[in-house]
Amino acid sequence: IKAKLTVGITPILAEQLNDEHLKHGFVKYLDSRIAQVTKDLERYPDPKVAHSQHLKYLAKYYFDWFNHIKDSFVNKYGMDLIGEFKKYQDLGCIEITTSGATHGFSPLLATDSNLNAQFKVGSDTTKRLFGRKAKGCWLPECAYRQGYEYVGKDGKKHWRPAIEVTLQNNDIEYFFTESHVIEGGNSIGNRRVIGVYGNIEYIPLPERPATGYDTYSAYWLPDAQVAVMGRNDRAGYQVWSAADG
């Protein structure tokens, strides 16, 4: 079944999955977990330990769990997850998107050359590992920056192009960003619920008025022939929220 799914694999993750040291290290990690739960299987049930029958059940559960993962990784996928993703990409089941090479926070990168390097190296990495250039991109941390005018060190005014111009220069046709960029409003509410930064207080920012757009559609941008889509709040909560996911 060709699911027609978009799968975002950042260049950093792709390089890690392709690294031989990491592959064999993962197998060693699984072996160590299996060895630990094997000891627990031998230890329980123990009449001197409360709830030891349940501890036996848990040990068996994790024994099966880690062995299943190892069997899949080693025997089913041949320790080559990149190859498996590429296979389903080539079959037309999935489309793999790229991202910044080192997950650099795009709006804070000091120069356009820094920004371009992030997405050029990221795009080249995706092509090298998966055999084709990505058409789409997940912005690191979904962080977007529009074009703006600034005063340079020379005292003159300069124009800094929006992020999508750099993406277009690297043959990227669409990208994903945060929901409030599309819909308006404030991003603080989302960040208090979504992700690892949920308990950090933020300095309140002026709330943008509602735009009338939603995250169920893609939109062409005026500065480049690139489309943008926003991360859907409801789907984001289901994935990231510790309370609602």
Give the label of every model feature segment.
Residues 1-245:
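Carbohydrate-active enzymes and regulators
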